[in-house]
A protein has these predicted regions:
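Short beta-strand segments enriched in hydrophobic/aromatic residues
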Residues: 181, 262, 327, 336-339
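A short, well-structured edge-of-sheet supersecondary motif
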Residues: 12-55, 78, 293-295, 322-326, ...
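Catalytic tyrosine of NAD(P)H-dependent dehydrogenase/reductases that use a Tyr as the general acid/base
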Residues: 53-56, 167-169
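Active-site SXXK
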Residues: 54-82, 177-182, 255, 330
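Short, gly/Ser/Thr-rich active-site loops of penicillin-recognizing serine hydrolases
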Residues: 279, 298-300, 342-361
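Short, glycine/proline-biased beta-turn/loop segments that scaffold the active-site neighborhood
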Residues: 77-96
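Glycine-rich phosphate/pyrophosphate-binding beta-alpha loops
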Residues: 241-248, 310-325, 332, 337-343
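Short, surface-exposed loop or secondary-structure junction motifs
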Residues: 29-33, 93-313
Length: 361
C-alpha cells in the first residue's frame, strides 16, 4: 500500500470514528469540528466543510502577505519607519518607552513580528482595561470597530518596550499595520486584503462582513458559531474587532486555496515568504512566530511523545482555528472547533494528524 493510500485509510478508519465519538460527547450548541486535510493523493474532510466560519487570528497572515506583496510591488519597505510610510497617521497618543519617537523608530516589520512594544488592547496588561478587551467588548455587541479605533485603545496602557527590543503578541500590531497599508494604497483595509490576497488567491467566499455588511445581511449570515468565554458572538457587530487584525469569514476550502497560492503558487516570492515564515520569537512552548506566520513545534509540547514531528507553518485563531501548511509533506490542515474552550483539544487533534503525516516524508 502506498503511503498516501495508507494515510487515507487511517483517516477513514481511525480519525473519522474518533471525531464521531467526540461529536457525540459535545454539548448540543457546539457543532462538529470543521476539518479539511489535503495532501498529494489524500483528502479528508469532517463536519460542515462548506459552512462559513471566522478565522480569528488565523487571518493575521492575510495582513502580512498583503504587506509583503506591496513590498514586492515596490510600494513600501517592511523596514521603513511608519512616519515615512504613512506620515498622516498620528502615533503621539500611543505608549512608548522613554526617549522613543515611534514615527521614526517603529517599522512595519516590527508590527508584523509583534516586536513593536505596543500593548494588546484585546487582552490588556493586568490592572488595565479597554473597551475592546475580551471581557468588555460584548457590553456593546452592536458596535462596529475599525483598525484605527482598536489602535486608539492602547492610549493609557503601559509600553512594553522599545521597537524591536522584545516580543509581545497583540492585536494592536496588526490593526496599526492595516492602517499603514490603507494610507499607502489609498484603499480601505478590506479592499487591500481583497485585492492583494483574497482575489489573487482565488478565495471567492472570503470577506469581512462584520465590518462591511448591512445589519440585515449580517443577521442572515450562515456562519458557524463562535463561542468566547461562554458567549456566542458569531453574528454580533462587535466581532468586527476581530477583523482589525485581518480576521475574516471564510471556508476551509478557501483557506487551502490561500495556502496553496502562498506556498506553492506565485502569491509571493520565495525570499519574502521565507522572511514571513522564519521563526523569531516564542509565544509559548510549541508556538513560535515569524513576521506574520506561526510555526508549531509539537516536540516542545510533549517531548517524549511528539519529538521529530514535522513543523507546520500558518495561523492560529482564538476559538481553536488552525490553518497550517506542511512544506515537506505538501499537506494542508485547516480546522475550526468553534470555541475558546476547545483550544487544548484542537492541539491534541492536530498532533494526531501530524504524526500520521510523517508517512508522506
Amino acid at each position: 500500500m502506498r503511503s498516501s493510500e495508507s494515510l487515507q485509510h487511517w483517516f477513514e478508519t481511525s480519525l473519522r470514528p474518533r471525531l464521531q465519538r467526540m461529536v457525540a460527547k459535545r454539548r448540543p450548541d457546539l457543532p462538529a469540528p470543521q476539518l479539511l486535510v489535503v495532501a498529494p493523493g489524500v483528502r479528508f474532510s469532517f463536519g460542515e466543510v462548506d459552512r462559513l466560519f471566522h478565522t480569528a487570528s488565523a487571518g493575521k497572515p492575510f495582513v502580512a502577505v498583503a504587506a509583503a506583496r506591496l513590498a514586492q510591488q515596490g510600494q513600501l519597505s517592511l523596514d521603513a519607519p511608519i512616519g515615512e510610510l504613512a506620515p498622516d497617521i498620528d502615533l503621539s497618543a500611543l505608549p512608548t518607552a522613554p526617549g522613543v519617537i515611534l514615527s521614526r523608530e517603529l517599522t512595519l516589520g516590527h508590527l508584523l513580528s509583534h516586536r513593536s512594544g505596543l500593548p494588546d488592547p484585546m487582552e490588556p496588561p493586568r490592572g488595565h482595561s479597554t473597551e475592546c478587551s475580551l471581557d468588555r467588548i460584548m457590553r456593546q455587541p452592536d458596535r462596529r470597530w475599525d483598525p484605527a479605533e482598536v489602535v486608539a485603545q492602547c492610549a493609557g496602557l503601559p509600553s512594553l518596550g522599545r521597537p524591536g527590543e522584545s516580543f509581545a503578541y497583540g492585536d494592536a500590531n496588526y490593526a496599526l499595520a492595516q492602517c499603514v497599508l490603507q494610507e499607502v494604497t489609498g484603499l480601505s483595509t478590506h479592499e487591500v486584503l481583497r485585492t492583494q490576497v483574497f482575489q489573487p488567491a482565488g478565495m471567492t467566499r472570503t470577506g469581512q462582513p462584520h465590518s462591511t455588511a448591512t445589519d440585515e445581511e449580517l443577521a442572515g449570515l450562515q456562519i458557524a458559531p463562535v463561542w468566547v468565554k461562554g458567549a456566542e458572538i458569531s453574528h454580533t457587530r462587535a466581532l468586527s474587532a476581530g477583523s482589525a487584525d485581518g480576521g475574516a469569514v471564510t471556508t476551509l476550502e478557501d483557506m487551502v486555496r490561500f495556502q496553496e497560492a502562498l506556498h506553492e503558487g506565485d502569491l509571493l516570492n520565495r525570499d519574502l515568504l521565507a522572511c514571513l515564515a522564519r521563526p523569531r520569537s516564542r509565544l509559548r512552548a510549541g508556538l513560535h512566530y515569524g513576521t506574520g506566520l506561526a510555526t508549531i513545534r509539537f516536540g516542545e509540547l510533549m517531548p517524549l511523545v511528539l519529538r521529530g514531528l514535522p513543523e507546520p507553518v500558518g495561523g492560529l485563531g482564538l476559538w481553536a482555528v488552525h490553518c497550517f501548511f506542511y512544506p515537506r509533506q505538501r499537506a494542508h490542515v485547516v480546522m475550526n472547533l468553534h470555541s475558546t474552550a476547545q483550544m487544548r483539544r484542537s492541539f491534541t487533534l492536530h498532533a494526531a494528524i501530524a504524526r500520521q503525516l510523517t508517512r508522506l516524508s
